[in-house]
């Protein structure tokens, strides 16, 4: 089973439900496209096309700074293997120039806010090293969703900062059911340092019928002893233009 993501504009949506009933949501629209293969490799092009929303509102305060700096990364051209492994940033010099210039502007604007300056400096260090930056991209939820169906059985999905910050869950999807238009996946086992009492998962993929997909949705519920249930929902859905 191998499928590429269908080119176009997509909405990326992320949501976390906590045991106390609180939730956190994040969404943004991006454009996704591929170049033709060259020696087996292709370039995945990701470009931002709309504003981000956090809990249904435009980013404020520190979130605004994170959004401001993060948006400068686009367009991002990533050379990938046939199985979806990121190999290099084709336009790395261009990306770094934009990112470092904007980072300096932000630090100058917020020079009296040491936490913001420290955050920007940390981000600059991460992006300056292409290998470290490439690793960060490869572990991002949005990238992992894009390339998941290129090698379902071979991909190990890493879900970071869940159920808590600096926690990480690693797992693989298996195909539970399939027909001409849909693919249903599940997660039989999760690897993590945190003890989970139970977990429930399901993923839905909509096929276009042309060896591509244009919608993927994943829901994971984990139970922690003494805490209760944490739910994570991720979705990447094409917008009809």
Sequence positions of predicted segments:
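Acidic, serine/threonine-rich low-complexity disordered tracts
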Residues: 1-80, 144-241
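A glycine-biased structural micro-motif
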Residues: 66-81, 85, 92-97, 101-104
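Solvent-exposed helix/loop surface patches that form functional interfaces
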Residues: 87-184
